[in-house]
Amino acid sequence: MKHTLACLALAAVCALPAHNATGCTSMIVSAEASLDGRPILWKHRDTSASNNFLYRVDGKGRYGYVALFNGSDRLSLEEAWQGMNDAGFAIMNTVAYNLPANDEDFADREGYVMAKALQQCRTVDDFEALLQSLPKPMGVRTCFGVLDAEGNGAYFETDDYTWTRFDLEDAPGGVLIRTNYAYSGEPDAGLGYIRHRNVEDILAAQIESGSITPASLTEGLSRSFYHALKGYDEAECSERWAVDQDFIPRYSSTASIAIEGIGEGEEPSAMTMWANLGYPPCSHVVAVTLDSIPEEALPTSPRGAYSPLGLEASKLKEEVFPVKKGNGKRYIDLDAVRRISDEQYKISLEEYARRRR
């Protein structure tokens, strides 16, 4: 009863206008902080591209790779938005709104840089060398997160001309978190401060015990409507409606992907990408390897280069955001979330269990 009253008493806080900017949430987990002794690179993606697909690319560089691409009417593989390659290198990014703005005529090049990195990088140091070699301005304003087969990880907070490196080995608790502000950027500017706290609060016990798993991220974070300022999960309240504000899953969310690196003595072929495509509470993970992508995650839709998994999640998302008039898309039907997410969660757990037998 006390918890329900707290939900009602703080309802007014939810009435604040939601920000229109898209915002990703990400994390790099060291081998020491993970339950299975394998490092993890995770990104909860937010973007205006409503559908994603996975694809393997060969013949464009030194290494073949599997990556996330924007869905479209045609198959375009020029910009990768998260991926892993045959050398055991993985990469992702989150936009950092408190870094210097790009030159107007050359911006939004992050996907091109990540595709190039997957084609030619083996180590974290290789990626820094790539940044050094790229023509300036680079057209980026972002936190690049990278992981390699030796278990090294880092964020590179990067603008058109410079970057600041944060190594995983120096991170308290063996984890690094980034949302949409750079630690090296303008103080108190940017976005995602509450989402950053959401991650810290939800995973506090697992970080302390070194027991994080890929499911902690794709299921524990990407399905959570916890709000750090309120101190509880909205989906656990008895209320039906919530405003889409400062949760990890947002109206603009289109994927949650945890790339599980390799353990000691393993080859890069042992890497697994746990991929949830579409609005994460309305979808489920599929296990992806460097030589195997489930058909539902490929661009196999009759509509064009879209994934069936993402399209199905989009249909279910309509039930979560049923109000179409005015600011309707800002309102979450928590009854629908609870029902749909619980169903998809069970499918995810079955996939995790199947792959780990």
Tell where the protein language model's regions lie, with residue ranges:
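Secretory/export targeting leaders with adjacent low-complexity proregions
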Residues: D126-G145, N152
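C-terminal, well-structured catalytic/ligand-binding subdomain of enzymes
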Residues: G23-L77, Q82-G83, A87, N93-Q119, ...
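Sec/Tat-exported extracytoplasmic proteins
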Residues: A31, C121-R122, L134-P135
